[in-house]
Amino acid sequence: MTTKKFRMEDVGLSKLKVEKNPKDVKQTEWKSVLPNEVYRVARESGTETPHTGGFNDHFEKGRYVCLCCGSELFNSDAKFWAGCGWPAFSESVGQDANIVRIVDRSHGMHRTEVRCKTCDAHLGHVFNDGPKETTGERYCINSVCMAFEKKD
C-alpha cells in the first residue's frame, strides 16, 4: 500500500488557527492537524514502511518541503533512485539551510539523523553511500514528512 503524496495545502502549520513559531507548537496541536502516520513519523521519530511512501517512485520537477512547517528541504534535481525503499536525495537545499544533523545511536546503530531546523520534525537519515559524482551522500527521507510543490 502506497501512502498519499502530500501537497502544499496539506502542510500542518497552515492548519493551525493562530500564527506561531513552529518550535512553539505543542505536541497536542501537531497531533490535531497532522494525519496519524505523519505525526508518528515526524513528531515521534518513527519510520514509514519501506517501499510504501508516495514519493519513493516520484520524479516530477519541483521542490519538497517539510509537511509540518513548510520549510524547503530538497529540490527534485537532487533526487535519485537508490532502491532503499525511501526517497533519496544527494543534497539538501542550501547545504542544510533548513536541516539539522544529529548523531543517532539508537537500535544499536551509528547513523546521522536529519531533522527540520525550523520545527524539529524527524525527516530521516543521511548516509555516506550516495552517488560519488555528486556529494557522495544519500538523504533517506520518509515520504510522509514531505509535501511536494510542482515546478511549472
Curated annotation (Swiss-Prot):
The keyword Metal-binding applies. Pfam families: SelR (PF01641). Residues 27-151 form the MsrB domain. Its EC number is 1.8.4.12. It catalyses: L-methionyl-[protein] + [thioredoxin]-disulfide + H2O = L-methionyl-(R)-S-oxide-[protein] + [thioredoxin]-dithiol. The active site is at residue 140. GO terms for cellular component: cytoplasm. GO terms for molecular function: metal ion binding; peptide-methionine (R)-S-oxide reductase activity. One of its GO terms (biological process) is response to oxidative stress. Zn(2+) binds at residues 66, 69, 116, 119. Its cofactor is Zn(2+). It is an enzyme of class 1 (oxidoreductase). Binds 1 zinc ion per subunit. The keyword Oxidoreductase applies. Keywords: Metal-binding, Oxidoreductase, Zinc. Methionine-sulfoxide reductase that specifically reduces methionine (R)-sulfoxide back to methionine. While in many cases, methionine oxidation is the result of random oxidation following oxidative stress, methionine oxidation is also a post-translational modification that takes place on specific residue. NCBIfam families: peptide-methionine (R)-S-oxide reductase MsrB (TIGR00357). PANTHER family: METHIONINE SULFOXIDE REDUCTASE, METHIONINE-R-SULFOXIDE REDUCTASE B1. Belongs to the MsrB Met sulfoxide reductase family. This is Probable methionine-R-sulfoxide reductase B.
